[in-house]
Each structure stands twice: as structure tokens, then as C-alpha cells.
């Protein structure tokens, strides 16, 4: 048998990493296959912890300041599905940001939920997403019987919502708040802890420890931030949504990564912040990431541009010619993710790579609008309906069975159960002409309700 995946991984594994996972390919714990065990005598059971895993949960809870913390090995995706199931019942209205992660959209399908969308503020001139409008939030909860709200903070690019104000508004109406804090586990070990979801009073909080701090991919946590939900509630849904074969190596990596953060991570984060300040000074960094709808930007997310290149081109050039792996690139920006495991020398090499490019004009930003289409069916009803594949050009007035959106930025043009308009068809044409990937499009066809 050929081993194409192994061959490709070996090609890139030794390059400097400014992407996920947070361990950056460095040996931060004993990854010994002999430790890849199951639920035998003395090793406890993640789905009903009463021994060493329960003890570990208590240690994690102390670090994060939660009522209870629980390991999941299905990533933040699985943890979000647990949280959404805990907080809702079929047919409930749930408030979500339109630019939310696909796992939350899939949670709508799994739980047969009716989404009420919050527009995430989009700056057309900067092609950047920020926070949410508090007046719109108040209007949505006054005019809808909302069962729960799911927020994302920090976002992929590091913008942190004004969570205290938002959660206060929602809790005044007794609405449970779930925060997808997948990109924010490191906040609890920095001065930004005061902006974290648990400190802001969220009811359920999800962290991907593998994203920003050292642990293996799929390592995640779900926290109870309040007593709105019980330990029994959490355990019941963990048993439904978490695998019955949780990886002990993933669990051990969470333990090792959090131990590292507790012992060394705080001081290393301070050092990396200073390193990044030096890099930005050296390259005359002038991107304005501020907006009144966000309270802070995560300094461990580094968004930048190179003259004359798209972000995708920068990512490709870095990995081929600079031996540096970045997290992602879009039509305008490249994104690097820094963790405490990165070194000052690696950030120096990132600086030198950026300075190696000639000055020039940046790619012109094309302003875009992302209006929310009319909804005719609930997501689950649309998804389970009989469908047919047709050319997107012939889809005007049809109901979508899937998410169709531009990547970047990844926001749905149309989601499950929404009506495809002439405007959406024109948008798809525009994106394809600009070389932007359109998810949900297979060749030129999309799936609609028959």
C-alpha cells in the first residue's frame, strides 16, 4: 500500500509553525504508544469519571475558575454539540452569529433548532469581522422567544467580544449563554483573562486546548460557568455526543499542556507578546484591528499583508520558500498563530521573511455585502428533504439543502432552508471570477429541495 498522507506530512513537519496545533510540532509530553490505553482497572472512565480523570477535572476547574470542567476528545465541535443539546429542545429558537463556525450550524441540524441570526459587524473597507450590535441583540431577544444564545469569542482573527455587556443583556431575559471560546484557552493564563467567557459569566464555555496551547489535535474542554446546568445534565449529554473510545493520549496531552501553562506558560506568553511588539515595530505594522464592538484583540493572532499578493499566495510562498507554516490566507490577509511554545528565534525568522518582500501596493479590497436570505424551512427539515442537484445559475427561488458560502471569509451566502435569490447567484459569479472558493458548490451545481 502507498502512504501518500505520511509522505506529505513528512515534507512539512519540520517547518517553523505559526499555525495550529499549539504544540508547534515540539515534544511537550511523553507521546509513548504504551500510554495509549483504554478504561482498564485504575485508569478511570471519561464517560463516568470517579477516579483519576475526576481528579484531573478538578485540577482543570481550579485553573479556569469554572464550576466544573470536563475533557472532550471530539474537539470543540463535539463540545459545542453537547452544550447546544443541554440548552435547547427540538424546535427552539436559538440566537447565533451569522459568521459562526460550521459546527454550530451542524448543531442546528442535530437538535432541530430554529436559528435567529445576529449580524456580525463587517467592515467592508478592511474586509474584517468584528463584534455584534447591542441594539440588534436587544431587538432580537425582544421579538423572539429565544431558548439559548451561542456566541464566538475570540473569533478566528483574535477579536474579543464585549462579553460582560452581552451576557448581562441575555441573562436579564433568563437566556442561557454558550460561548464558543475555542480560540481562547490561553486567555486564562494572561492579562486578557478579565475578558474571558468564564469571567464574564457565561453558562457554558468551550475551549480547544489544541489551538492556542500545547495539546494534541481534538483536545477540548467544556466548562460549566454557572449552576444553570447541573453535573448530571453535562454527564448525560457527554455520554451521547462524546466517543466511547476517548484517546488517553489526547487526555494526557491536555493534562501536560495545562501543567506547562500553569508552570511556564504565563511567563512565556509575556515574552511572546514582547517578541511580537518588536516584530511589528520592525515591519512598520499599520493594520488597524480596532472596533468599538470588540473589547480587545488577542496579540497571539498575527494578521498581516504582503504587497501585491493575496493571503493565499503568501501562505504558499512561505511554506515553499521560507520554510514557515502559516495558519491560513484569504483574498487579502495571511494569519499567523503564535503560542507560548514558539521561540523568540522563530519570531525573528518570521520578521525576516516578511522584510524579504519588496514594498509596493496592496491588493485592492473589494467591498462585499452578505445579506441574510429569507428562511422557508428549518435547517433540519431542509437537510432531510428530498433534493436534487442543479446548476447554481438556475437556482433562483429554490430552497437550499446545504450551506453555500465564499471562503474566504466563510460566511454563508445561504444556509439550510433559505431561499436562493438572484443576488446570491450574482454573488457566486463574482466570487468565482475573483478566484474565491465557494463551499457547497460541486463544479457548478448545488443541492436544493426537490
Task: Identify the residue ranges that each predicted region occupies.
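N-terminal "arm"/small-domain region of PLP-dependent enzymes with the aminotransferase-like
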Residues: 1-51, 175
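Conserved PLP-enzyme active-site core in the AAT-like
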Residues: 2-8, 27-29, 76-289, 306
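Conserved N-terminal alpha-helix of the aminotransferase class I/II PLP-enzyme fold
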Residues: 33, 37-75, 99
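General small-molecule cofactor/ligand-binding pocket signal
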Residues: 70, 116-118, 327
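Short glycine-rich or small-residue beta-strand-to-loop segments that form or flank ligand, phosphate
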Residues: 70-72, 149-152, 337
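Conserved C-terminal alpha-helix-loop-beta "cap" of PLP-dependent enzymes
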Residues: 284-416, 422-439
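Charge-dense polyanion-binding interfaces
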Residues: 437-450
